[in-house]
Amino acid sequence: ENIYLNGAVMGMDRAFMNQHFDEIVEFSELQEFVDVPVKNYSSGMISRLGFAIATVVRADILVVDEILAVGDFKFQEKCKAKMRELLEGGTTLLFVSHNGDQVKELCSRAIWLNHGVVMEDGPADVVYDKYAAMMEQS
């Protein structure tokens, strides 16, 4: 039910979720926890499930907010590979992170926001380096 509920929140019907159920479970690596209520999931488990469902939807734009801040290294690498695959397929990725290495690795362009104000917009490495310099000063 966890998968169907999350899918419904994203506007996917039960038939679509049935069609992609095995793919979602396999990617999330939650096979042994698939029947455990979400309220008993850790934040990492919730993120795994949400990311797996979001990536089977094949949307034009995928918003990924700090997904790589949770989970183990192996799963983070799996997520990065999936994001690269989606980017190569034409999906626009809105990637939110405070991790400079991840931003530089996954993004060609970055926008640094500070309380909703655009501080910098440009190549990811340049924008992140300016952000990091500012953070070191404060």
Segments predicted by a language model, with ranges:
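A short, surface-exposed alpha-helical micro-motif characterized by mixed small hydrophobic
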Residues: V103-E105
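Helical segment within the ABC ATPase nucleotide-binding domain
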Residues: Q76-G89
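ABC ATPase "signature
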Residues: D121-G122
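H-loop/switch region of ABC-family ATPase nucleotide-binding domains
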Residues: S97-H98
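Conserved ABC ATPase "signature" region
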Residues: Y4, F16-F33, A52
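A short, proline-enriched helix->beta-strand linker immediately N-terminal to the Walker B motif
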Residues: T55-V64
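Q-loop/switch helix immediately C-terminal to the Walker
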Residues: E1-A8
